[in-house]
């Protein structure tokens, strides 16, 4: 192998917003800040959060139906 062509690896910490710290190695020489990790992501924890989208769907349907009505009037 040739010398001095491989990147240097540093031991860093990936810090999640929930407080979980994940030690890892990277060529990046600084710590990473994560939004979610396996300790707090709903898929891994099994705690699914239901979002009430009824208002959003109704608003979309209302806008969409108005645009269809307007296009039919122009024809």
Curated annotation (Swiss-Prot):
- Which pairs of positions does the record mark as disulfide bonds? none
Annotated keywords: Metal-binding, Ribonucleoprotein, Ribosomal protein, RNA-binding, rRNA-binding, Zinc
Instruction: Extract the SUPFAM superfamilies matched here.
Output: L28p-like
Any one GO MF term held by the record is: metal ion binding
Per UniProt, subunit arrangement is:
Part of the 50S ribosomal subunit.
Q: What does the UniProt record say this protein does?
A: Binds the 23S rRNA.
Q: What is this protein called?
A: Large ribosomal subunit protein bL31
Name the source organism: Baumannia cicadellinicola subsp. Homalodisca coagulata
What gene is it encoded by?
A: rpmE
